[in-house]
Amino acid sequence: MSRVCTMTGKKANNAYAVSHSHRRTKKLQEANLQWKRVWWSEGNRWVKLRISTKAIKTIEKKGLAVFAREVGLNLNLY
């Protein structure tokens, strides 16, 4: 399974690791993804999602149903 947030679509960023002597090697900066069980009140059940920590904060602020509607996510599939 790829490391992509189901709500925001966040994924890894290509970057350089720069040493003290300024040698550059490629590295991946992965998104901080968590498996999170969130209560979906409209569906009256738990939904298990792989989401970023920023998406967790947004769900706490707006609510799961509103945020899913904004990003166009069908919660019946989860």
Curated annotation (Swiss-Prot):
GO molecular function: structural constituent of ribosome
Pfam families with a match to the protein in the record: Ribosomal_L28 (PF00830)
Keyword field contains Phosphoprotein: no
Positions in coiled-coil regions: none
GO cellular component: ribonucleoprotein complex; ribosome
Swiss-Prot/TrEMBL keywords: Ribonucleoprotein, Ribosomal protein
SUPFAM superfamilies recorded: L28p-like (SSF143800)
GO biological process, one term: translation
Organism superkingdom: Bacteria
Similarity comment: Belongs to the bacterial ribosomal protein bL28 family.
Name of the protein in question: Large ribosomal subunit protein bL28
Origin species: Microcystis aeruginosa (strain NIES-843 / IAM M-2473)
Upper classification of the organism: Bacteria, Bacillati, Cyanobacteriota, Cyanophyceae, Oscillatoriophycideae
